[in-house]
Amino acid sequence: SPALSGLDPGAHALVRIATLIAVDAAPPSYMSAVSAALDAGLSMEQIVETLIAVMPTVGVARVVSAAPKLGLALGYDVSEAFEVVASDDLER
């Protein structure tokens, strides 16, 4: 809990998200951490920037694996986004 960690709620939520990225957690695991981050007043951009912050430590492959999971937790329709990219590639 944030009270036990000594961190403010926003920092605590970002640490939780960073940990989920590091351990390659399943998509449902991101839901409560993202909810806590948003409840703490963090923006979606700040939450996504966690991917960039942890990349030097966890590696690109782990961040690439985590990005769609984090996107789903933020409410993005990740499969639709991939379909748009695929159709754009077909049109070229």
Residue ranges of predicted features:
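Short linear loop/turn motifs
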Residues: 50-54, 84-86
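Acidic, glycine/proline-rich low-complexity segments that act as flexible tails and inter-domain linkers
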Residues: 1-11, 22-24, 28-31, 35, ...
